[in-house]
A protein has these predicted regions:
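Small-residue-enriched, tightly packed secondary-structure blocks
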Residues: 13-170
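N-terminal export signals
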Residues: 1-9
Length: 170
């Protein structure tokens, strides 16, 4: 409870330049995993990159992070991701996530909404890092793909489901 709240507090809000730097680092890390993500990176209408999401909890868990929506590899808007949950979970973890919008329609829908809850407002497919090698622009079946990478620490019960993305001003 208290530990999780202090770790994931929005008081840790970052400046625009710090977010840009963290997004660049996360993108390099994602690319360093091999060519498996090349097709998604190159052909996506937009990428919502959320580096350094902090998650913590003991029974009650919270998470918070800030990142940028990239269109044409340039940041165009800034977002936060936050969640709260109750259940079988414990630990502290830091990780990054990327949401790949594979169509202009899904990207436009995301940008027009005032907040977006994963799994409720738009369907997505969470892909395992090892599965990406089989995904290319000819086999996309969903408008949004998500990946979690760069995990540090241990947290039982990690998921993007129920996390809320909100536009922020930086």
């Amino acid at each position: 409870g208290i530990i999780a709240t202090s770790i994931t507090s929005p008081a840790l809000a970052a400046s625009r330049s710090r977010i840009d730097s963290r997004v660049d680092t996360a993108m390099r890390e994602l690319k360093s995993l091999g060519n498996r993500f090349s097709n998604l990176i190159d052909s996506s209408a937009g990428i919502l990159m959320m580096p350094r999401i902090r998650r913590g909890g003991f029974g009650f868990g919270t998470s918070y992070g800030e990142g940028a929506l990239l269109i044409g590899k340039a940041p165009v808007e800034y977002y936060s991701i936050a969640s709260a949950s109750f259940g079988l979970q414990f630990g502290i973890q830091r990780y990054s996530s990327a949401m790949f919008f594979t169509s202009e329609r899904s990207l436009t829908r995301f940008r027009r909404q005032d907040g977006w809850t994963v799994g409720a407002d738009l369907g997505y497919t969470l892909i395992d890092q090892g599965d990406v090698i089989d995904i290319d622009s000819n086999t996309y079946t969903d408008d949004v793909y998500g990946v979690i990478f760069g995990q540090e620490g241990l947290h039982i019960g990690i998921s993007l489901e129920g996390s809320k993305y909100s536009r922020i001003v930086r």
